[in-house]
Amino acid sequence: MRFSSPRYTLSLAVAAALLAPDGRTQTATPVSGNQEATTLDAVIVSGTARFKGLAKRDASFSITTASPEQIQQAVPQSTADLLKIVPGVWAEPSGGGTGANIFVRGMPSEGDAPFVTMQLDGSPLFPPPTLSFLENSTLFRVDDTVERMEVLRGGSSPIFSNGQPGLTVNFIQKKGQDEPEGSVRLTGGNNALRRIDVFNSGPMGNGWYYSVGGFFRETDGVRDPQFSADKGGQFSATLSKRWDNGELSFYARHTDDNNAFYTAIPLLSRNNGNDLSSFPGLNAQTGTLLGRDFRNVDLLVGPDGQTLRRDLADGRGVNIDVFGGEWNWESGGWTVADRFNVISGSAPTYALFTGDAPQRLGDFIASYGSSGSASYTNGGGVVDANQQVLEAGWWSVDKRLNSFTNDLRLSRELFAGNTLTVGAYYAKYSSADTWYLGNTMLLTAQNNARRIDVALDDGRQATRQGFTSTAFLNLRAKYDGENIAAFVADEWELSERLRLDLGARYERQSVTGDVHDTTTVDLDGNPATLYDNATSLALATTRRIDQNDEALSWTAGLNFTLDQHNSLFARVNSGVKFPGFDNLRDGQTRVQDVDQYELGLKSGTSVYDLYLTAFYNTFKNSPFQAFLANGENFTAVGDSRARGLEVEGAIRPFGGFELAGTGVWLDAKYRNYREFTGNQVMRQPKRQFRITPSYYWMLPFGDLKVFATYSYIGERFADLANSQRLPSYDMLDIGANLHVGEHWEVTASGSNVTDTLGLTEGNVRVPGAATGGVFMGRPIAGRQYQMSVAYRW
């Protein structure tokens, strides 16, 4: 090997061992002089029929893997933000630690993450990938208990697990090994970040192994809301029993974490949207409308003064318990694998949702057809009529979640080189929802906004404690879903170089639910109290949802090995996305059909890695819902198609230097979408790429690695009509990792160190709403720094 970096050389030489799918001790085969270990040797388990997995070079699909070091080097601000290292994926992390919008390969959606499934040790955390106000990355926190991440794009995923046609993100936990190990990590940073991570594992005797770990963190947040924006933690444990021919393991995880959720703020837009700047009094990189003035509120939700106490600090968080396990066994030529997962808990959203652009207070008062005056709700005197104000809703969404999943597979070699796998997947899940959407407040358009009360001269009362309205939607609903699927997969090594895999899946989904009817009332019966004249109330009567759907999915893949350094693959699949709870509630009952085609190249030596994938996909029956600028609640169903090219790779030309990168070119268009046919699929850039140079030094007392990542995000459109253009932007992250001796590690990193003002979304709740150069949008966070010190044993 030509590198002076023993740590890097070792990582290549034992790639297969480090990424082995089961927890039994693996022995790495030494690399001979005429055989180079490459990333193609790494064993992956996601998207494979058997629990043993297969080498990357033999996989006829696109998959990205990341070790703990690579995860740390990505400087992620959240679980969703970590996905920026995956080509073909666009994650919008600007909402904070949770509640991201994640898009995959031009697959159409207005937000959330309907084409992303989060797995823990191969089991989906929650079977439906997205509910309104809940995308699956919200349910997971990355910490030092994670051994690696595997991200499968398309490929064979429509056949296995929950049949996700888009992106499957599998976080694989560390398990106990023969040698005890552990770590303690302390992290600090700007915005008063304080965090501790712990991990410990080892043998218990008689083939039993354990691991425990978790974290606790508190911070003022990437945008300081005048209270702890992110506060909470997680605890995990695994227990494993190993035999010569199998393994049984269990895990438990409790997550109780609250995260402030950030939505659009006013910005200044000039030069046809190419030049963005901060709105006066509200810094685009660090500012937020959130503040202590309305952190704790009493929402008026019913007659006779009925109120609901809510706290913004609870944010978009989770209080979730997860319990699961897996059993892998080989006997008499048969292989049995079973995975199960149980989840129970709550995932609320208490957040501020903005609407139209700011205006003068005087103009706001005049809109009532009367003169009047205004004062701060919590003291501070009269508010000047020239003060810029806006209306924003204090939304309260409660979700109670429960689910159970089980994935059973039975495999046997039928003849030399041909292995057949049959399996069954079962999921039972529910969500109990209570929503109060609306609750509009009149706020000063400034950092840490303040509520304003208006007194009209004609005697009408426009506000109550700064609230100009109550809920426009009071939703009470209880949903239950059940999915049953049977699948078959055949892997056939036609020759030493040619490998074929085929698969089919039949699935049936049954959904029932009760949605309470609503009515709109004047809560106090007094038309002069304007703030409660149009209040949505849930009634005792309900509307029944009862729908059964079934579908067949299939896939075929071919992998051709050119030599030990190069292979080609082709893949075609046809999958579905069943309508979710919220789709069925809104009358969107069609099953979405997804067809995908892929061609790829995988190439690697000790000097370079290269993964190229060309893809094409088509969608039918894709639903869309949005509030347009004219007040129309627009819903539609249409089609789309996308084509693109993904690249992922690295080059190591000399010494400890490496230049890694990912990128995607995407052309995604709507089809059969009324007047929007031919428009670019919303919120997804045509081009994005990331380049990461790094250098590694051996030192007398340890080693040092420095790295930086330059990211470019191309222009996008915030809405279906392509009327809100989001300009391109670039940013720079930096970091360094120092090992001192065998035990100490120091890591320092900075994200967006150039303090770039980049926009991830416009105000999709009111598309096109912009006046006088003022634009409602959600920018990325400004410059952030953090440093950690770890001790390992």
Task: List the predicted regions and their residue ranges.
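Acidic/polar loop-and-plug regions of large Gram-negative outer-membrane beta-barrel proteins
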Residues: S240-R242, E247-V322, P348-W395, A449-Y479, ...
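Transmembrane beta-barrel wall of Gram-negative outer-membrane proteins
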Residues: E181-S183, G188-R292, G315-W329, R505
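N-terminal periplasmic accessory domains that precede
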Residues: T79-L82, N101-G106, V116-Q119, N136-L139, ...
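C-terminal beta-signal and adjacent terminal beta-strands/loops
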Residues: K620, E658, S711-D719, N737-W793
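Structural signature of Gram-negative outer-membrane beta-barrels, strongest in the C-terminal barrel
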Residues: K399-S403, E413, G417-Y429, L442, ...
